[in-house]
A protein has these predicted regions:
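Beta-strand-centric surfaces of beta-sandwich/beta-rich domains
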Residues: 1-341
Length: 341
C-alpha cells in the first residue's frame, strides 16, 4: 500500500514567499486573486531563512525558480545542529551545475527527468528526496554573488511521527578545475556514522584532446576499506550507460538519456553530438533501488581517464546520502568563479 492512499494524522505545511512562516491559513492575506509577494529578495552577501519549523516531521518536496545560479548556496540543518548537513550551490544540488558562462545558454536549462530531481524548462528546479527530522528543521539560502537577486520557492512537508531509526539527508559539493592529472577525483569522503549513500550528480568539462574521456573507474570504499568493495569498470558504466555513451561506435557520436535513477542528460559545446574537445556533460546516478549501506563511514572516487591515459578535465559534483546524527562537518565550499568556459 502506497503512503499517499493511507489516512494518517500528518499535518501538511508549505513555506513560500507568500507564506514565509508556513502557518496554516498563513498565505496571501488580503490578496485574493492577486500576487502579493511571489518572490523573496536576497541581497548580495545576505543569508535568508526559508524554512524554520519544529519536529517531528519531514520535507517532501522543494521547488525553486527565479535566480537559481551557482552564487546561491543552499544549506539544511537538522535537529538544531550548529553546522549544516546539506551545503551546495543550488544549481549543483539540482544536478545542473553548468548554469552560466557558456556560449550556448539561451535562458533555459536542459531537462533532467528523474524520480528524485526534476529540472524543467525555464529553470524550474524540483527535489523529491524525503528529508525526515525529529526535533527541528532549518533551511537557508545565501547569496554569495555581487548582485541582489530574487528567488521563487515553495517547500512542502508534513509534521508527523518519524521512526527512531531514520537517517538524516545529507549533500556535499565538490569541484576540481582541473582534476590533478594521474589522481582520482573524490566524489565524497569524510563521512562518519551509519547510513547509506544514495547518489551523485556530476558535471564534467573537457580539456585537451578530443578523445574518449569515460574510461575512469568509479570506486566505493565502505567503512575501513583499504581497497574498494564496489568497483565500476568505467565512468559511463557507473552512470548506467556503455561504450562511451555512444549510439554509433563507428562514427563516435554521443546519445543523451534520462531515466528514473540515472542519465547523461545534457551536452554543451560545439558539435555536441560527436567526440570533441571542450564539451561539457551533465550526469546523475541515484541509488534508490540499490542504496550503498555503511556502518562507520563511506568514500567514493572517480578516475579521470580516457583511451590515451589520465586526463585533466574539470569535475564538479554533489553527493547525497542518509546517516545518523551527529555527522562530521562537511568539507568547506571552494568558492570562486565556478565555471568560466
Amino acid at each position: 500500500m502506497k503512503p499517499y492512499c493511507m489516512i494518517s494524522n500528518a499535518k501538511t505545511f508549505a513555506f513560500s514567499a507568500e507564506n514565509p512562516t508556513g502557518a496554516r491559513a498563513g498565505g496571501s492575506k488580503g490578496g485574493d486573486c492577486t500576487k502579493l509577494s511571489p518572490t523573496v529578495a536576497i541581497r548580495a552577501g545576505e543569508t535568508v531563512t526559508l524554512v524554520d519549523t519544529d519536529g517531528p516531521g519531514m520535507i517532501q518536496s522543494i521547488w525553486f525558480t527565479g535566480y537559481v545560479g551557482h552564487s546561491f548556496v543552499i544549506r539544511m540543518y537538522w535537529d538544531n545542529c550548529e553546522y549544516p548537513s546539506v551545503e551546495a550551490p543550488i544549481s549543483a544540488f539540482f544536478g545542473t551545475a553548468y548554469d552560466e558562462n557558456f556560449v550556448d545558454r539561451d535562458g533555459k536549462y536542459a531537462v533532467l527527468n528523474s524520480a528524485q530531481i526534476l529540472v524543467a524548462p525555464g529553470r524550474g528546479l524540483n527535489c523529491y528526496w524525503e528529508m525526515p527530522f525529529k526535533k527541528h528543521c532549518r533551511i537557508t539560502m545565501e547569496n554569495r554573488g555581487e548582485k541582489d537577486q530574487s528567488l521563487y520557492y515553495i517547500i512542502t512537508g508534513c509534521h508527523c511521527e518519524v521512526p527512531d531509526e531514520i537517517g538524516y539527508f545529507h549533500a556535499s559539493y565538490r569541484q576540481e578545475h582541473p582534476v590533478q592529472k594521474g589522481r582520482s577525483y573524490t566524489i565524497i569522503d569524510g563521512i562518519q556514522g551509519k547510513g547509506q549513500f544514495v547518489g551523485v550528480t556530476l558535471a564534467t568539462g573537457m580539456n585537451g584532446n578530443n578523445t574518449c574521456w569515460v574510461e575512469g573507474e568509479a570506486r566505493m570504499y565502505i567503512d575501513d576499506d583499504k581497497y574498494p568493495s564496489i568497483h565500476y569498470t568505467g565512468t559511463e558504466d557507473y552512470f548506467c550507460g556503455s561504450y562511451g555513451f555512444g549510439n554509433d561506435v563507428q562514427i563516435k557520436s554521443y546519445q543523451t538519456y534520462s531515466g528514473l535513477y540515472s542519465g547523461m542528460y545534457a551536452i554543451y559545446g560545439d558539435n555536441r553530438a560527436f567526440y570533441n574537445g571542450q564539451q561539457r556533460f551533465l550526469l546523475y546516478r541515484f541509488h534508490v533501488a540499490d542504496p550503498i549501506h555503511f556502518e562507520t563511514g563511506f568514500r567514493m572516487t572517480l578516475d579521470n581517464m580516457g583511451w590515451t591515459g589520465p586526463r585533466y578535465d574539470d569535475y564538479t559534483s554533489c553527493a547525497y546520502w542518509y546517516q545518523t546524527l551527529p555527522s562530521a562537518p562537511l568539507k568547506p565550499l571552494l568558492f570562486k568563479v565556478f565555471f568560466t568556459k
